[in-house]
């Protein structure tokens, strides 16, 4: 079963990115054909700063590799290194009704938040469809806010298949409900937009500051505390197995510890969990040529599959 996902190189990764998406990708490597790319074309909808995009792409590659993406088990590449995706994007646009794109929630939301209403942003779902359909993807792991884009890709695939025969595999969105939403320091969904993140590769000083900012209620130190509605507990349980969660729950119910104690505990959890990943991340950033070699290795494999797919499409469209 082929699984594909792409993540934009939009700066520092946070634990919401990891538990909401990256961990599932790493786990999927053992039982599925995992295709993963750094979506630098998509990132251009929010920034056209070339040097920043280049550096963020290298940082993203280092981050994903340090967190467990294995280029020997997964096909891992930079989106712009497989040009066929832009060719398919143009072809698919001929099968995409304007009304389908006008109904896209993501476009409306981003424009409402002040992002420029460019053609690139408007047609973002068509490029995402090209990413998915080019590789005959069966499963697309996404957050709830991206389900509609996978549905659009499926609609486009059906329209093309009705015209040309069964040329595209119909994709399905997969949402991990258990970690569909990772709460941020303010209790809302963790997001860079909300400035409520706990960043994976930040300094220990920054990490401590972010965890210290977690919003809690005013329950006194000596009193029992409600773990179910506590943002610290909601984040901490991501790092704990069932017995660890139970032990922490008992500490909450017993009383005698303040939220400051639990923040110190969470800080220790996060530091220990990502210690090796941080070390590897810093090592990789010092070797940009090695990162490029890894991305080139993945792009070669992805390009071969893409070219074979495009050859079939050329025959259908007369190119």
From Swiss-Prot:
Single GO molecular function: ATP binding
SUPFAM superfamilies given in the database record: Nucleotidylyl transferase
Any single biological process term in GO: tryptophanyl-tRNA aminoacylation
Main location as per UniProt: cytoplasm
InterPro entries per the UniProt record, alphabetical: aa-tRNA-synth_I_CS, aa-tRNA-synth_Ic, Rossmann-like_a/b/a_fold, Trp-tRNA-ligase, Trp-tRNA-ligase_bac-type, Trp-tRNA_synthetase
Binding site for L-tryptophan: 131
Cited PROSITE patterns: AA_TRNA_LIGASE_I
Short sequence motif named 'KMSKS' region, residue ranges: 189-193
Keywords: Aminoacyl-tRNA synthetase, ATP-binding, Cytoplasm, Ligase, Nucleotide-binding, Protein biosynthesis
Subcellular location: Cytoplasm
Binding residue positions for ATP: 8-10, 16-17, 143-145, 182, 189-193
The keyword Nucleotide-binding belongs to this UniProt entry's keyword annotation: yes
Cellular component GO terms held in the UniProt record: cytosol
Functional note: Catalyzes the attachment of tryptophan to tRNA(Trp).
Protein family (similarity comment): Belongs to the class-I aminoacyl-tRNA synthetase family.
Protein's name according to its UniProt entry: Tryptophan--tRNA ligase
């Amino acid at each position: 079963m082929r699984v594909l996902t792409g993540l934009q190189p939009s700066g520092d990764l946070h634990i919401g990115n990891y538990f909401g998406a990256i961990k599932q990708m790493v786990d999927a490597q053992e039982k599925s054909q995992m295709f993963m790319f750094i979506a630098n074309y998509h990132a251009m909808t929010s920034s056209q700063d070339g040097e920043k995009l280049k550096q963020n792409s290298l940082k993203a590659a280092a981050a994903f590799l340090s967190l467990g993406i294995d280029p020997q088990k997964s096909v891992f590449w930079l989106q712009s290194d497989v040009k066929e995706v832009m060719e398919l994007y143009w072809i698919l646009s001929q099968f995409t009704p304007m009304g389908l794109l006008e109904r896209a929630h993501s476009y409306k939301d981003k424009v409402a938040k002040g992002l420029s209403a460019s053609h690139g942003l408007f047609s973002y779902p068509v490029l995402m469809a090209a990413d998915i359909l080019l590789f005959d993807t069966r499963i697309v792991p996404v957050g709830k806010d991206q389900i509609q884009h996978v549905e659009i890709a499926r609609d486009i695939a059906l329209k093309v298949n009705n015209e040309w025969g069964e040329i595209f595999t119909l994709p399905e969105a997969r949402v991990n409900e258990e970690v569909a939403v990772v709460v941020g320091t303010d209790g809302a969904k963790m997001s860079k937009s909300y400035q409520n993140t706990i960043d994976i590769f930040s300094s220990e000083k920054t990490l401590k500051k972010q965890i210290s900012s977690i919003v809690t209620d005013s329950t006194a130190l000596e009193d029992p505390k409600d773990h179910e509605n506590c943002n610290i507990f909601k984040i901490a349980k991501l790092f704990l197995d069932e017995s660890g969660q139970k032990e922490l729950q008992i500490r909450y119910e017993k009383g005698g510890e303040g939220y400051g104690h639990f923040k110190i505990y969470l800080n220790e959890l996060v530091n220990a969990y990502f210690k090796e990943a941080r070390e590897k991340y810093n090592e990789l950033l010092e070797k940009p040529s090695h990162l490029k070699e890894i991305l080139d290795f993945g792009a070669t494999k992805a390009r071969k599959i893409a070219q074979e797919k495009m050859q079939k499409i050329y025959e259908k469209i007369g190119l």
